[in-house]
Amino acid sequence: MAKGQSLQDPFLNALRRERVPVSIYLVNGIKLQGQVESFDQFVILLKNTVSQMVYKHAISTVVPARPFNVTGHQNAQGGYGPQDDVPSGE
């Protein structure tokens, strides 16, 4: 799995687990809204009144509608949440 997905997967999984409403902005400017139902390496299944399969390569930004907890879990690729950052020497 690509190194760039070490934060992406826990982020999307937390959105899915906590059923956080999201706005997904596509590269062409279209805004989609709903909840992340599932996802894989290439697509996100977004559920609102209908389910939409959104290809990740078409996504610009994912904006959660409310705060949620994505921190505190090391994933299989070794990624960490912000509270696990290496101290800056202070």
Curated annotation (Swiss-Prot):
Per UniProt, residues of the Sm domain are 9-68
Gene3D superfamilies this protein is in? Answer: 2.30.30.100
Per the record, the GO terms for biological process are: regulation of DNA-templated transcription; regulation of RNA stability; regulation of translation, ncRNA-mediated
Where are its TM segments located? Answer: none
Write out the entry's keywords from A to Z.
Answer: RNA-binding, Stress response
- Keyword RNA-binding on this protein? yes
GO CC annotations on file: cytosol
> Which molecular function terms from Gene Ontology are attached?
RNA binding
Where is the segment annotated Disordered?
71-90
State the family it belongs to.
Answer: Belongs to the Hfq family.
The protein's name is RNA-binding protein Hfq
Q: Which species is this record about?
A: Shewanella sp. (strain W3-18-1)
